[in-house]
C-alpha cells in the first residue's frame, strides 16, 4: 500500500482527491491537513465520504508527512514550494495540484503569480504531469507538477496537430469555457449564485496565468515557438471545461485518422467519431477527455472540441493517474469511473 498524505483537504480539488483515493485499492490515506479545521472529522465536512474516510483533519505540523511515500498538495499557489525541499530530502515524492512547479522559467512564473518562488532550484527537476505527453519522465519523478484544468483541455486538443507539424503554429486560438468550481471553494462575488447563474462571460482576455503554461507545453511539442490566443469564459455550470480550438492546416491531412492514431492507446482520451460534438456532461466526475475534430466545409481550418471535468482530468484525477505511473501501477486504478448523468 502507498502511504499518502494530503495537504489542503478542504477545497474542491481536495475533496475530489479524497473521493478518488478512498476507492483506490493501493492507497493508504494516513494524513489530511487543514490549519483551520484541525480536529474535525473529514466526513463531518464532507458527508459524501462518510464510511470511506475515517480520518480527522490535522495541522501540517502534526501530520508526519515525512513518513509518507507521496504527498499531494491540494493547496493555493505558493504553499507546496515552501515545503518541497524538506519532503524531497526525506525521500517523499510530491504531487502539486497548484502551479508552483509548472512553469520552468522562474521569472515568468513570478511575473504571472505575483510572488517570489521559494524553491527555484527545484523547478528544473519537476516533471510536468501530462501523461499523454510525459509518461516516461513521470515514472521517475520526485516532484510532479500537475497540469492546470484549462491547460489540460487545450493541450490534449492541440497535441496531435502540433506534434505532427501540420498546422500554422503562429496563430493558434483557444476559446475555452469553465464551470464555477474552477475558481475554487473560496467566497468571491463573481461565483455567488446570484452573480454566476443565468450568466455567461469572458474574463482575463488581456492575459490569464494559464497562458504561459499552455504555451510552454505547446512549444515543447512543436520544438519551436508558437503564437497562441487564449480566452477563458465563466459559465453557469458547476464542473466541466469545453475548449473550442482553432488552427489553420499547413498541409492536407486526414485529421480524424491523425487523432485516432495518436490516442489509440490512451486510456483516458476518447476520440469521438467524425462529426461529433462532445458535451461536458459526458465526462462529469470521470477522468476522461473527449475530443472531436472537424474541418468545416472542408476548408483549411481545423476545429477541435475538447471536454474534461475540471476537477478530475483537470486536477485530482490526473494527479492520481500520475501517482499510478510513478508507483508502477495500472494507470486506471481508482479511476475506472463512469461519468455521471444527468
Swiss-Prot record:
PANTHER family in the cross-refs:
N-ACETYL-GAMMA-GLUTAMYL-PHOSPHATE REDUCTASE, CHLOROPLASTIC-RELATED (PTHR32338:SF10), N-ACETYL-GAMMA-GLUTAMYL-PHOSPHATE REDUCTASE, CHLOROPLASTIC-RELATED-RELATED (PTHR32338)
Q: Which domain of life is it from?
A: Bacteria
Query: Per UniProt, what is the name of the gene that codes for the protein in this document?
Result: argC
Functionally, this protein is described as follows:
Catalyzes the NADPH-dependent reduction of N-acetyl-5-glutamyl phosphate to yield N-acetyl-L-glutamate 5-semialdehyde.
Tell me the SUPFAM superfamilies matching this sequence.
Glyceraldehyde-3-phosphate dehydrogenase-like, C-terminal domain (SSF55347), NAD(P)-binding Rossmann-fold domains (SSF51735)
Cross-referenced InterPro entries? AGPR_AS, AGPR_type-1, NAD(P)-bd_dom_sf, NAGSA_dehydrogenase, Semialdehyde_DH_NAD-bd
Q: State the organism named in the record.
A: Aromatoleum aromaticum (strain DSM 19018 / LMG 30748 / EbN1) (Azoarcus sp. (strain EbN1))
The Swiss-Prot or TrEMBL record describes its family as follows: Belongs to the NAGSA dehydrogenase family. Type 1 subfamily.
| Cited PROSITE patterns | ARGC
Q: Which Gene3D superfamilies match?
A: Dihydrodipicolinate Reductase, domain 2, NAD(P)-binding Rossmann-like Domain
Active-site residues, as the UniProt record annotates them: 149
Q: What is this protein called?
A: N-acetyl-gamma-glutamyl-phosphate reductase
Can you tell me which residues the record assigns to a coiled coil?
Answer: none
Give a GO cellular-component term: cytoplasm
Amino acid at each position: 500500500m502507498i502511504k499518502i498524505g494530503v495537504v489542503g483537504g478542504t477545497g474542491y480539488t481536495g475533496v475530489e482527491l479524497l473521493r478518488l483515493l478512498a476507492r483506490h485499492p493501493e492507497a493508504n490515506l494516513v494524513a489530511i491537513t487543514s490549519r483551520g479545521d484541525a480536529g474535525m472529522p473529514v466526513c463531518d465536512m464532507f458527508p459524501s465520504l462518510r464510511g470511506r474516510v475515517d480520518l480527522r483533519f490535522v495541522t501540517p505540523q502534526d501530520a508526519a508527512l515525512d513518513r509518507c511515500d507521496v504527498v499531494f498538495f491540494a493547496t493555493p499557489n505558493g504553499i507546496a514550494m515552501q515545503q518541497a525541499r524538506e519532503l524531497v530530502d526525506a525521500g517523499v515524492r510530491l504531487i502539486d495540484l497548484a502551479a508552483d512547479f509548472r512553469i520552468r522559467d522562474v521569472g515568468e512564473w513570478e511575473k504571472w503569480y505575483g510572488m517570489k518562488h521559494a524553491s527555484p532550484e527545484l523547478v528544473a527537476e519537476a516533471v510536468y504531469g501530462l501523461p499523454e505527453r510525459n509518461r516516461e519522465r513521470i515514472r521517475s519523478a520526485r516532484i510532479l507538477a500537475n497540469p492546470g484544468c484549462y491547460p489540460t483541455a487545450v493541450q490534449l486538443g492541440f497535441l496531435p496537430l502540433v506534434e505532427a507539424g501540420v498546422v500554422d503554429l503562429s496563430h493558434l486560438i483557444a476559446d475555452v469555457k469553465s464551470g464555477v468550481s474552477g475558481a475554487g471553494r473560496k467566497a468571491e462575488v463573481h461565483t455567488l449564485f446570484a452573480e454566476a447563474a443565468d450568466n455567461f462571460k469572458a474574463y482575463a482576455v488581456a492575459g490569464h496565468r494559464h497562458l504561459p503554461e499552455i504555451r510552454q507545453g505547446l512549444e515543447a511539442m512543436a520544438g519551436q515557438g508558437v503564437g497562441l490566443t487564449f480566452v477563458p469564459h465563466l459559465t453557469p455550470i458547476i464542473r466541466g471545461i469545453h475548449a473550442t480550438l482553432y488552427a489553420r492546416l499547413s498541409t492536407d491531412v486526414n485529421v480524424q485518422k491523425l487523432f485516432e492514431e495518436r490516442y489509440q492507446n490512451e486510456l483516458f482520451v476518447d476520440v469521438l467519431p467524425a462529426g461529433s460534438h462532445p458535451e461536458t456532461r459526458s465526462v462529469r466526475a470521470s477522468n476522461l477527455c473527449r475530443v472531436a475534430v472537424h474541418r468545416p466545409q472542408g476548408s483549411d481550418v481545423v476545429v477541435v472540441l475538447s471536454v474534461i471535468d475540471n476537477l478530475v482530468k483537470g486536477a485530482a484525477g490526473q494527479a492520481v493517474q500520475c501517482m499510478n505511473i510513478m508507483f508502477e501501477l495500472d494507470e486506471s486504478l481508482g479511476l475506472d469511473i463512469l461519468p455521471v448523468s444527468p
